[in-house]
Amino acid sequence: MSNYKILHTSDWHIGKKIENFSILKEQKNFLYFLLEFIKKENIDLLLVAGDVYDSKRPGFEEQRLVNNFFYELSFTSCKWCVVISGNHDKKDYLSINKKLLSRFNFFLITEYDSDEQIVLLKDNGNLKFIVVCLPHINERLILGQNFDNIFGLEDQYSSKLFLENLENAYREKISNLSNFLENKYKGIPKILMAHSFFGSSKKIDTLGGSYIIPFNVFGNGFSYVALGHIHKFMKLRDNIVYSGSPMQYSFNETCDKYINVLHFNDNKLILQEAFPVPIFNKLIFAKGSLNEVLDFLANSKKEESFTIYLKIELNEAVDTSAEESIYDLARLNFMNLVSISYSLPSSQDLQDDSNFIGELEVLEMDEKYFFEKKLRWDFENGVIRDIKFKEEELISLFNEVLANGYLGEYEDK
């Protein structure tokens, strides 16, 4: 009887910043947790479904952190590790790991169409798992150059034709792979990894310029589908799962994060367990009046187990001394204050009579126009107070900086 444990994770985004705050320390804590979890649970296979890095050009510290993790992984119970690239990854940087870990069963797949995209995992010479890898690819490249002049036209038939062909291309590729593997390796568990948007609709759809592929393109030929790209833990079907990101990376994300552990027994998936990831950072958005925000900060508990990043939106204008009070209270509670913004009831006064600045106006007006318009509104509504410069002096100073800036005199300042 053979038992194996598989851990599915994705979207680490190592090197990610919360505004200007580095969270590399928190990400290091996550990777330490993950390594210890793998040791404790005796994980046999680690699947990382894309976006290891946040930038296509990660810095030295980010690369060292990732490389050290995979190096340490090679000394654990983990027999294999399979990683695919996401839309944030660049294969050149990920490939460093591949060279470092050649002695370890480390498989890195960065090409959508490649002989390496079918990974055969063996234990003592016996084939145990097959992992099919579909790293992220710009969907428009899937169909080649034939649709370059079709996509983007306003003609409804052209865009509909593109979407139908894109869905069919996904479906055909996955179906061909599934049928080939089933005929050649019958009875061996097959896992598919992909990094893209998939949804529960029956037909392909678009949202904000992104394509949402129906998950039914996966068919029924895989024991498990390990997905990356969406930061929320989500099951499209019981065996089609987004593991989500391990940490909160935006203020509209929940801080509930998971890693998914699969239990295989005699080539069958018998159990899935979603283990919560400890909170290493928390992003909080606080909105209200000055007094409400100050009360919130005064009553907040100091957290030592994780780092807090705070965004504040005030519904009333305050002076700089009030903003300083907010910053001071945040610091006392070990909170990183990302920004203070305003959502004022009279903000429509900033807009022109048509209620919105028209497209023509945006094209015709320059930086001076928008600076003067915003500055005048700030003076009239009390956002700017207690400064030694008059409105006219600030405008004159801005014009000077703008002129010198164009000449490059402020480039190093």
Swiss-Prot record:
> Which keywords, in A-to-Z order, does the entry hold?
Exonuclease, Hydrolase, Nuclease
Task: State whether it acts alone or in a complex, and with which partners, per the record.
Answer: Heterodimer of SbcC and SbcD.
Q: Which family does it belong to?
A: Belongs to the SbcD family.
* Matches recorded under PANTHER family: COMPONENT OF ATP-DEPENDENT DSDNA EXONUCLEASE, NUCLEASE SBCCD SUBUNIT D
**GO molecular function terms listed in the Swiss-Prot or TrEMBL record:** 3'-5' exonuclease activity; endonuclease activity
Q: Which GO terms describe its biological process?
A: DNA metabolic process
- Free-text function comment from the UniProt entry: SbcCD cleaves DNA hairpin structures. These structures can inhibit DNA replication and are intermediates in certain DNA recombination reactions. The complex acts as a 3'->5' double strand exonuclease that can open hairpins. It also has a 5' single-strand endonuclease activity.
Q: Which Pfam families does this UniProt record tie to the protein? A: Metallophos (PF00149)
Q: Does this entry carry the keyword Methyltransferase? A: no
Membrane-crossing residue ranges in chain numbering: none
The molecule here is called: Nuclease SbcCD subunit D
Keyword Hydrolase (UniProt): yes
